[in-house]
Curated annotation (Swiss-Prot):
It is found in: Virion; Host nucleus; Host early endosome; Host Golgi apparatus. GO terms for cellular component: host cell; host cell endosome; host cell Golgi apparatus; host cell nucleus; viral capsid. It holds the Pfam family Late_protein_L2. Minor protein of the capsid that localizes along the inner surface of the virion, within the central cavities beneath the L1 pentamers. Plays a role in capsid stabilization through interaction with the major capsid protein L1. Once the virion enters the host cell, L2 escorts the genomic DNA into the nucleus by promoting escape from the endosomal compartments and traffic through the host Golgi network. Its main location: virion. It comes from Human papillomavirus 5. A motif (Nuclear localization signal) lies at residues 1-10, 510-517. The lineage of its organism: Viruses, Monodnaviria, Shotokuvirae, Cossaviricota, Papovaviricetes. Disulfide bonds join C19-C25. This is Minor capsid protein L2. One of its GO terms (molecular function) is DNA binding. The gene is L2.
């Protein structure tokens, strides 16, 4: 009998890949591949509570961590009476890197006898503002020009000699001017010149004023030259008449139809004329033809077509729009009287033939609004920066100069130069026929306060905010009535009772009953 041949089992990874989708994997294959064996679970859950990272396990060093290995049963590596010894394997320590030795230098050594109290000094705060800007001016030497040989003249007369020395030639000088301008965004100036006297520039802000402009009395007479004012480019007006309006955005179809002879919206022979007084004709004319819902989004600026069934009669909201099938777009024009007219051309569907054709007349619905007037020219203002806003006033120019001789005094010849008669008022006031009016005549109101006979003095307050209220004091001699105020309760006494007994209230009497005696 032949022995069966042993077939080697396939690898666990290949078996897991083929049997995982079919779900026929053996349990040992699943546990090994997914690492769910007993050993894997011990390592997985045990590592959560115990940490062996500092012992150097599986690192190949075997140093036993920072404290080394300690023999079992001996406790820590400390012996009584001696120095503690640490058992380490004989391994060469690894060199991490060179150690840099930094020398420590004492800048200000402190002596032992010095005081330990550190004195405090006042220090100025940090200067946040920029300091003075240092300006350096470079002086370039003047280049030497061509040398000029000046002859030396010697004059000898007799025994003395005179030496004439010619002056040194002055070389030409060169001047260079540098300029720096800083931009300040918070400062705005006028970018164009002012039409009045004075001029404002962009860089230096130089104010230029003329030397004349005032009035001088008693001076020299000069010739007056007639000058012509030069208008500025901003001082002009445009006055154009408004062209007459005939219509607003007419359709080409209306223009072609209007060329036909005899056809017009106002032709009473071909088009029925209906004047509409309802204001809905301007905004929502469809509500005059049929009852419908209001749609605020829809603007009825187009032609409206209404499909009505002639078998079913519907009364329109407005009787003038009966049987209207089509209502055209609005047309704007002017009447001979100068009013604005809003017109709509409508078509009625009065008769319908057997073939389905609808026959009706054309109706011209219109409403006159107002007249068209020519607009007055409006003075427009320029946008942005422009000149003419600022006014520059120069004091000496606006003053008046009077030439007079101070040495002459016309009042010096008069004896009574400062007479008090000059202060008297010679006007005579006449009050004949005058009338004295107190208060304001336009707001004269009469108030009547009633008087009541009461035992108390009444106080009345009349509110008067328009005129004057005059109160006249009055004195009255009325006898004062004093009413008694008893402190004990009121007792009713009946003098006709002679029994001397008390008075019993009827409600306290005993009721009489009929009793039967046996």
């Amino acid at each position: 009998m032949a022995r069966a041949k042993t077939v080697k089992r396939d690898s666990v990874t290949h078996i897991y890949q083929t049997c995982k989708q079919a779900g026929t994997c053996p349990p040992d294959v699943i546990n090994k591949v997914e690492q769910t064996t007993v050993a894997d679970n011990i390592l997985k859950y045990g590592s959560a509570g115990v940490f062996f990272g500092g012992l150097g396990i599986s690192t190949g060093r075997g140093t036993g961590g920072a404290t080394g290995y300690v023999p079992l049963g001996e406790g820590p590596g400390v012996r009584v009476g001696g120095t503690p010894t640490v058992v380490r394997p004989s391994l060469v320590p690894e060199t991490i890197g060179p150690v840099d030795i930094l020398p420590i230098d004492t800048v200000n050594p402190v002596e032992p006898t010095a005081s330990s109290v550190v004195p405090l000094t006042e220090s100025t705060g940090a200067d946040l503002l920029p300091g003075e800007v240092e300006t350096i001016a470079e002086i370039h030497p003047v280049p030497e020009g061509p040398s000029v040989d000046t002859p030396v003249v010697t004059t000898s007369t007799g025994s003395s000699a005179v030496l004439e020395v010619a002056p040194e030639p002055i070389p030409p000088t060169r001047v260079r001017v540098s300029r720096t301008q800083y931009h300040n965004p918070s400062f705005q100036i006028i970018t164009e010149s002012t039409p009045a006297q004075g001029e404002s520039s962009l860089a230096d802000h130089v104010l230029v004023t003329s030397g004349s402009g005032g009035q001088r009395i008693g001076g020299d007479i000069t010739d007056i030259i007639e000058l012509e004012e030069i208008p500025s480019r901003y001082t002009f007006e445009i006055e154009e008449p408004t062209p007459p309006r005939r219509s607003s955005t007419p359709l080409p179809r209306n223009q072609s139809v209007g060329r036909r002879r005899g056809f017009s919206l106002t032709n009473r022979r071909l088009v029925q004329q209906v004047q509409v007084d309802n204001p809905l004709f301007l905004t929502q004319p469809s509500k005059l033809v049929r009852f419908a819902f209001d749609n605020p989004v829809f603007e009825e600026e187009v032609t409206n077509i209404f499909e009505n069934d002639l078998d079913v009669f519907e009364e329109p909201p407005d009787r003038d729009f009966l049987d209207v099938r089509e209502l055209g777009r609005p047309q704007y024009s002017t009447t001979p009287a100068g009013y604005v007219r809003v017109s709509r051309l409508g078509t009625r569907a009065t008769i319908r033939t057997r073939s389905g054709a609808q026959i009706g007349s054309q109706v011209h619905f219109y409403r006159d609004l107002s007249s068209i007037n020519t607009e007055d020219p409006i003075e427009l203002q320029l946008l942005g920066q422009h000149s003419g806003d600022a006014t520059i006033v120069h004091g000496p120019v606006e003053s008046t100069f009077i030439d007079m001789d101070i040495s002459e005094n016309p009042l010096s010849e008069s004896i009574e130069a400062y007479s008090h008669d000059l202060l008297l008022d010679e006007t005579v006031e006449d009050f004949s026929g005058s009338q004295l009016v107190i208060g304001n005549r336009r707001s004269t109101n009469s108030y009547t306060v009633p008087r009541f006979e009461t035992t108390r003095n009444g106080s009345y307050y009349t509110q008067d905010t328009k005129g004057y209220y005059v109160a006249y004091p009055e004195s009255r001699n009325n006898a004062e009535i004093i009413y008694p105020t008893p402190d004990i309760p009121v007792v009713i006494i009946h003098p006709h009772d002679s029994t001397g007994d008390f008075y019993l209230h009827p409600s306290l009497h005993r009721r009489k009953r009929k009793r039967k005696y046996l």
